[in-house]
Structure formats: C-alpha cells, structure tokens
Amino acid sequence: MIKNYLSHFLPVLLALDLIIPFLLAPFYKDYNHLTQVMSVLGNSKAPLHSIYNIWLVAFGVAILISTLQLYPTVAQVSSSISIMLFSVIVIYAVGGCILSGIFSVGETKSLETLSAKIHGYGSVIGFLLLTLAPLFVGLYFFKVSNGLLGILSLICFIFAIVFFALFVMADKPNYRGTIIAFEGLWQRLSLL
C-alpha cells in the first residue's frame, strides 16, 4: 500500500528536493545558490538546518522505499540492469541523503570532524554513482524497445556526467572567478 502511494508522489518528492533549498536559503544570510552546495543549509549555523537535515533523511527513506518497488519491475526485463540501477539508487539514498542528513557538514568543505567526513564521503560516493542511473535507465528502455526514451536517457547521462565533472572542478583554485566556480549550480543541474 505505502509503496503504491509513494510511487505517485515520487515526482513531487524529486521536485521538492530541488525546491526546499530555495525556500530555506532566504533565512541563511549570505547563502548563494550559485556558489554554495545545498548541504551548507544543513550545517549547524544555518537557522533552519534541522528542517533541511530531516528532509534529507525523509527523502532518502522515500527513495529507498520507491526503489524496492522499482526493482521487480526492471528485473522482469533484465536482472543485471535492475541490480545495477537498484545499487546506485540505494547508495545515493543512503550516502547522499540519509547519512548527509544525520551527519552535518560545516560551512566549508573542510573535512575536519568525523561528521563532516562521513557527510563528505557519503555524498560524493552517492552523487557520483547517481550519475550512472540515467545510463541504466537508458539500457532498460532499449531492452523494452523504447528507443526514444533510451536515447533521451543517454542524453541525460551525458549531461549528468558533464555537470558532475563541473561540480567537482568548481572548488579548484584554477577556476575561481570563472563560470566553472558555480559549484551550487552544477550540483543542482547534476540532479536534474
């Protein structure tokens, strides 16, 4: 029952994951969507950090539940694609959402505390693997003979890789003052 209910609201939850930072940011003085990652809204100095951290955990749990429904559907077509897609989504839900919500990061990306290290490594691994999801979705669509959605998924995969690469490059000193330095923008675009 809850799985069927959740599948109807998953698109809303995915949209909220991008919208909630825009709703919370006005309460955090000097927060910049273009240059700062969303996790900064969960650090202890952010006025509404508890709301953001609770959201991340709830969102991660919702993704896990919906993935349990997705797995058998994809497995009917290909068990290997299903396992790979399930794995990357679960790792993102746990590392990029649940652990990131439980273990806050500081205002900067320095990994000085155990909490910041767990958050940093969990979210990097989660986001990195999430970039592979459109590839597996594309393979699934090709298997079910839906070439158009397969091609669109592969295009999304290419964009995800490009945006993730820009996200990783954004904090490097060589790119300071350039469009590549828009770390927050690249993070958000990699999630689309």
Predicted regions and their residues:
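Hydrophobic, aromatic-enriched alpha-helical segments typical of multi-pass transmembrane helices
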Residues: I2-Y31, V37, L41, K45-L192
